[in-house]
Swiss-Prot record:
Name of the protein described by the UniProt record: Uncharacterized protein C11C11.01
UniProt-listed SMART domains: RPR, RRM
Compartment(s): Nucleus; Cytoplasm
Stretches the record annotates as Disordered: 1-22, 186-207, 425-448
Modified residues (Phosphoserine): S40, S42, S371
Listed Low complexity bias regions: 425-436
Entry annotated with the keyword Phosphoprotein: yes
A molecular-function term among this protein's GO annotations: RNA binding
Xref: InterPro entries: CID_dom, ENTH_VHS, Nucleotide-bd_a/b_plait_sf, RBD_domain_sf, RRM_dom, SR-CTD_assoc_factor
Ranges where the RRM domain occurs: 108-183
PROSITE patterns for the chain: CID (PS51391)
Species for this entry: Schizosaccharomyces pombe (strain 972 / ATCC 24843)
GO biological process, one term: mRNA cis splicing, via spliceosome
């Protein structure tokens, strides 16, 4: 027992030295007893000793925390107190126990309005100093000719008395309206207004493309054509920046309706018109691919449909008017057939209003779905008159491509030489076409030569030249 008593008498000095030297606390020595690194005659006495030392250590730690709270508690700003109270209300983790103690002090908030512009924090605090449980007073920035403020009380009775005092006694010539709550309100102070404006600016910036993305979009639109790779690159860009769908849609429409060239001499240039036609078709194909991805379930791509919908009718009307500028019936028919295919796909998807798509389909296809049975006699007369008028204007300008490049026999060409002098309709040409003889077989089938106009520009066989 002597050894134990001696050890008990000497250990407190060692423990105080360990505190001063900031070594590991004595609590950790219990692990050494568990590992049997220190031998003792009685385990019960060791447990009693360690329990006492642990209690001393915890008391010392709590004293240091209280001391730190008293040193820094008065230097806390009102904004920090409000934030800590809000964190405590939301059950968020607080860094240390000092924060919890400080939040527990804030119980009742007195929100003040109609404060005179002359009133300051000091004068208002002097008026409310008679209430002992007051913690903090603060006046926020002016809103017009009024000010708002807040006072924090620990005791409910003091808060109620303060409200009565402010409502009945004028401070700097004004009665202050006050209300009591047990939680802070969002007050329109300068910092809060600045933070709200920052959040609005950030939200607006998210809806806009960056300068680099905007330049990339303009570059992709400028080089857009009907090739799959060109359309695919712009489609990927639109899907990746789906949050900026409004700005991207505006860029598409701006390019689509921009038919005025930089040089006025190109207004009636065939190359420029063909280039614009390809650009418009490529934008229609791009819209079709974007709508398909929206229907197939790609994330948020359906937003583009709502951006396109208000402009679909104007867009299709512009396409129909542009088809009349292509300068040829063949070009116009090819252009209209490509647009009709896209419109039919949109009708099956029910992508836009059915009436708009139906009217556009009639314009481009030239059909009337309401009356599918057409008078055949009237159709023959109409086609006959139209082809007669065209033959008078385009006489002698037939090309080999109309006949797939198949050469014509020399004898047949000589027999029908007089036909080239007179513009003929389909009926007269069919009656005057020569029939093939039995001695020499014709190069064409009767069904091909009948009802056609043979051009002088056909090439001859090499064997017929000698």
């Amino acid at each position: 027992m002597k050894k134990n008593n001696e050890r008990v008498n000497t250990n407190p000095s060692l423990i105080s030295k360990s505190y001063n030297m900031k070594k590991r606390p004595v609590i950790g020595t219990r692990r050494h007893f568990a590992r049997k690194e220190i031998e003792s005659d009685s385990d019960d006495e060791d447990d009693i000793f360690l329990a006492g030392e642990r209690k001393k250590y915890l008391q010392n730690q709590s004293y240091e925390r209280r001391k730190q709270k008293n040193e820094h508690g008065n230097n806390l700003t009102l904004q920090e107190e409000l934030l800590r109270h809000e964190a405590y209300e939301k059950n968020e983790e607080i860094a240390n126990e000092n924060d919890v103690d400080q939040v527990n002090l804030m119980k009742y908030f007195v929100h003040m309005d109609n404060i005179s512009p002359v009133t300051t924090n000091g004068s208002l605090k002097e008026s409310l100093r008679k209430y002992s449980s007051i913690i903090a007073v603060n006046i926020f920035s002016e809103t017009g000719d009024l000010k708002k403020g807040i006072a924090i009380f620990q005791d409910l009775s003091d808060a109620e008395q303060a409200v009565q005092y402010l409502s009945n006694c004028k401070i700097d010539g004004r009665l202050i309206s006050a209300t009591i709550t047990n939680h802070p309100k969002r007050l329109p102070n300068a910092e809060h207004l600045e933070s709200s404006t920052k959040t609005k600016d950030e939200s607006q910036d998210k809806d806009k493309l960056t300068k680099l993305d905007r330049a990339k979009l303009e570059w992709l639109i400028q080089g857009l054509n009907c090739e799959k790779g060109s359309i695919g690159n712009l489609l990927c860009f639109a899907v990746e920046h789906v949050n900026n769908h409004v700005e991207i849609t505006d860029a598409f429409l701006k390019e689509f309706f921009n038919d005025q060239p930089t040089d006025d001499t190109k207004v009636y240039d065939d190359d420029y018109i063909n280039e614009r036609g390809e650009k418009k078709l490529s934008l229609i194909y791009l819209m079709n691919d974007i709508l398909f991805n929206g229907i197939s379930g790609t994330s948020l791509v359906w937003r583009y449909r709502f951006s396109f919908e208000p402009h679909v009718e104007r867009l299709l009307d512009d396409l129909y008017l542009f088809s009349k500028r292509l300068g040829g019936r063949i070009k116009e028919d090819i252009f209209c057939k490509k647009v009709v295919k896209v419109i039919e796909v949109w009708k099956t998807w029910i992508a836009f209003q059915e009436e708009t798509l139906e009217r556009a389909w009639r314009n481009f296809s030239g059909n009337t779905p309401q009356s599918p049975q057409i008078n055949s006699a009237a159709l023959k007369v109409e086609t006959k008159n139209s082809w007669t008028a065209i033959s008078e204007e385009t006489e002698g300008l037939q090309d080999d491509e109309e006949y797939n490049g198949i050469p014509v026999d020399v004898n047949e060409l000589l027999n029908v030489e007089f036909i080239s002098q007179i513009p003929m309709s389909t009926e007269t040409s069919s009656s005057s076409s020569p029939q093939p003889t039995e001695e020499r077989k014709a190069k064409f089938k009767p069904s091909f030569t009948q009802g056609t106009f043979v051009s002088k520009r056909m090439r001859m066989h090499a064997e017929d030249l000698f």
